[in-house]
Curated annotation (Swiss-Prot):
Lineage: Eukaryota, Metazoa, Chordata, Craniata, Vertebrata
PANTHER family: GLYCERALDEHYDE 3-PHOSPHATE DEHYDROGENASE, GLYCERALDEHYDE-3-PHOSPHATE DEHYDROGENASE
Binding site for D-glyceraldehyde 3-phosphate: 60-62, 91, 120-121
Record keywords, A-Z: Apoptosis, Cytoplasm, Cytoskeleton, Glycolysis, NAD, Nucleus, Oxidoreductase, S-nitrosylation, Transferase
Activates thiol group during catalysis (site feature) positions: 88
CC terms in the record's Gene Ontology section: cytoplasm; cytosol; microtubule cytoskeleton; nucleus
A single BP term in Gene Ontology: positive regulation of canonical NF-kappaB signal transduction
Family statement: Belongs to the glyceraldehyde-3-phosphate dehydrogenase family.
Pathway membership: Carbohydrate degradation; glycolysis; pyruvate from D-glyceraldehyde 3-phosphate: step 1/5
Organism, as annotated: Meleagris gallopavo (Wild turkey)
The record's account of how the chain is modified after translation: S-nitrosylation of Cys-61 leads to translocation to the nucleus.
Record's protein name: Glyceraldehyde-3-phosphate dehydrogenase
Length: 234
């Protein structure tokens, strides 16, 4: 095979993923964060890709949702600091019923019966693809009993004052322009099922966000964490 998508979640380092190269593959895409492989998010830093790189990471589905939105907001208004929460659909690593999960007791609780707080490196990883935001974002996840589609809540402090309508305008311009196909924009009264099979990395929900004032806002963006992410891998 010329290209191998490493999606087991096991071979996520350069050394381990390199086994595919030894097996005859020409390039490897890791569908997860990596400790040492270069990380790329389409629409954010993909232009920095160098053809000499044989192994790359496509980051997390949540990073692919957050990073394009964070880039647009930071480029236009400046993000001083921010906290992200993802309300995330069930994943393959969760338990069907309560069971052992090392020291992470909550992660071992039944996926279909609980809302489960969990850690995620998705927000911090944005700093790897947008260096100016390194150390300015962190976040957490709530795993919920739905089969697919997740949603990011980015609450951030802005450097430049902005009305919520200003934010909607610049996000829509990006969605219709340079980030078309990656960042979406909707003013419809949507819910999670509406995004099953949506190929965007991130769809900004204009009607769901709120502003406390011109410097402090909560922004909401949806993503099909399976199909949408798979489109970016391809």
């Amino acid at each position: 095979a010329e290209y191998v998508v490493e999606s087991t979640g096991v071979f996520t380092t350069m050394e381990k993923a390199g086994a595919h190269l030894k097996g005859g593959a020409k390039r490897v895409i890791i569908s997860a964060p990596s400790a040492d492989a270069p990380m790329f998010v389409m629409g954010v830093n993909h232009e920095k890709y160098d053809k000499s790189l044989k192994i790359v990471s496509n980051a997390l589905c949540t990073t692919n949702c957050l990073a394009p939105l964070a880039k647009v907001i930071h480029d236009n208004f400046g993000i001083v600091e921010g906290l992200m929460t993802t309300v995330h659909a069930i994943t393959a690593t969760q338990k069907t019923v309560d069971g052992p999960f090392g020291k992470l007791w909550r992660d071992g609780r039944g996926a279909a019966q609980n809302i489960i707080p969990a850690s995620t490196g998705a927000a911090k990883a944005v700093g790897k693809v947008i260096p100016e935001l390194n150390g300015k974002l962190t976040g957490m996840a709530f795993h919920v009993p739905t089969p697919n589609v997740s949603v990011v809540d980015l609450t951030c402090r802005l450097e430049k004052p902005a009305k919520y309508d200003d934010i909607k305008r610049v996000v829509k311009a990006a969605a219709d322009g340079p980030l078309k196909g990656i960042l979406g924009y909707t003013e419809d009264q949507v819910v999670s099922c509406d995004f099953n099979g949506d190929s965007h990395s991130s769809t900004f929900d204009a009607g769901a966000g709120i502003a406390l004032n011109d410097h402090f806002v909560k922004l909401v963006s949806w993503y099909d964490n399976e199909f949408g992410y798979s489109n970016r891998v391809v």
